[in-house]
A protein has these predicted regions:
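Flexible, active-site-proximal loop/turn residues at the rims of small-molecule/cofactor binding pockets
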Residues: 101, 113, 133
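A short glycine-rich, Lys/Arg-flanked "PGG" loop and its adjoining helix->strand segment in the class I
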Residues: 111-123
Length: 198
């Protein structure tokens, strides 16, 4: 059976992260952290191109799977919560957080995760965030907890709002590297992509 040559190169990397790759955001010798890496969906291209890559996730099974599949760099993957990372200040050139932050328990938890990622990000480094938001479906979501909403697809998620994003930029001295992008999936869910620097 023939394999898909594109999949061999990019794996199942998020399309908006591919956009950043294609724009040359990530340079050889950059140190990259995937904060909430899971089983490594977004790591394929970076691993294939020998980037200095680290990954954390609370799912111990996912981390063990990554360590097994990548034994030469197994010590760069370990279980950790995003809000309690053991890295040094300003350790990474880039941080990726894709489909992670909408699992925040509340706004305080979300702010802790953002602050911790900013802490370990080098000055002028990039922070890539992809998460659910209310942008475009503000009148279709129902608040069920502090920052947590029930969205039209029936799930409950912490949602990024325009106001919260502006607050976070101000509090953490972040600026946009790219315009905010939001995809509306048939008015049942919206996913926003934020790329910022400190």
């Amino acid at each position: 059976m023939a394999t898909n040559p594109i999949e061999e190169i990019i794996g199942s990397t998020d399309i908006y992260l591919l956009d950043q790759i294609m724009k040359g955001r990530y340079k050889m010798n950059d140190t990259i952290l995937d904060a909430g890496c899971g089983y490594g969906r977004n790591l394929h291209w970076f691993l294939r191109n020998n980037f200095v890559l680290y990954g954390i996730d609370q799912d111990v099974h996912a981390i063990h799977d990554l360590q097994r599949r990548h034994p030469l760099i197994a010590n760069r993957f370990f279980p950790s919560a995003v809000e309690k990372m053991l890295f040094e200040d300003a350790q990474f050139n880039h941080i990726i957080s894709s489909a992670v932050l909408h699992f925040a328990k509340d706004t305080a938890h979300f702010r802790q995760m953002i602050a911790e990622m900013v802490r370990v990000l080098k000055p002028s480094g990039s922070l890539f965030i992809r998460m659910t938001s209310d942008i475009g479906i503000e009148d279709k979501v129902r608040l069920v907890g502090e920052g947590v909403y029930e969205i039209p697809d029936g799930s409950r998620r912490f949602l990024l709002t325009r106001r919260l994003l502006e607050d976070l930029k101000r509090e953490n001295e972040l600026t946009f590297l790219e315009p905010l992008k939001t995809v509306n999936v048939d008015d049942v869910r919206c996913m926003s992509t934020v790329v910022v620097t400190r």
